[in-house]
Amino acid sequence: MAAAVVQMSMGYRGLLAVRNRGTGPLALGVVSSQLRAFSVRKEPELDENPYYGKYRDKIQQLRRTNPSAFDARLDKRKELKQQPLGYSKQAEFAKTVEEKVGTASGKGFSKNKTLDSILNIELIKDKDADEIREIWKQYFSLRNSVYAVIPGESFELIWRRAKTCPSFLYALPRKEGYEFFVGQWSGSELHFTALINIQTAGDAAPSQLILYHYPEFQKDKGIVLMTSEIDTKFLNVQDAQCLANQVQLFYGSDGAETFGLVEKFNHKSDEFKYMAVVSFLEQSGLGKSFLNEQGHNKEDKLE
């Protein structure tokens, strides 16, 4: 798709808007020169950012509870702008961040969410893969969660790649553009944190989504169980599903181009082009499908 950049919020790196100008798709992994020309030269005031209101409570909580830390992190914003977009300290705080700040829901994410805290493993260990899959589906089908039963071989590829490339930048389509999230693997958990949170709160930025993977049945049954916890003040189930689908796209696809982008983000950040993430998302159809689903959900609510 030929595209032109629509300048929003004076070039803020956490939000990018793209307007279609034609019907032809971009080649897979190719970003037009217009997209590369996207300007980030002027930094907006924090409260001018279109997503600031969404995270205001978290930021204000940090300001109230630890004002010196808040001021110090604001001072670092200029330094952060000079670093490659691929740079992130997520690996250092993904496991501890919820303990420091907690989530907006008030109860925080679960700590040490093991498989036996969800299901009685002893009761299902003798069942076959199809039976376990059906039990998992029935358990989560009425819950506000994203869940899956992943083929063992597929997860093995994702897991092997996650060990060498534990973080990546994901784009969540919005009506006005894209909201970016950094995903960071911590063991078999995958934490997602909004880029604007990282830029403003640093290592105190809380996650908005965690995907939990359970490989207990991978060897014997050939399946890996997955579920999630969502901070529903910031993300809905459709948002979380879109991010989870992108994990399969970038970590689980056979194509070298998609995982090559993940490798650049982790090991060659100076070569990483964040608009290539949008290009792959549009080429795969995930972005369009997500926006269509969001539109249908809004129509259903109006009826």
From Swiss-Prot:
The lineage of its organism: Eukaryota, Metazoa, Chordata, Craniata, Vertebrata. PANTHER family: ATP SYNTHASE MITOCHONDRIAL F1 COMPLEX ASSEMBLY FACTOR 1, CHAPERONE ATP11. Pfam families: ATP11. Has a complex stabilizing activity in the assembly of the mitochondrial F1-F0 complex. InterPro entries: ATP11. Residues 1-46 form a transit peptide. Belongs to the ATP11 family. This is ATP synthase mitochondrial F1 complex assembly factor 1. GO terms for molecular function: protein-containing complex stabilizing activity. The gene is atpaf1.
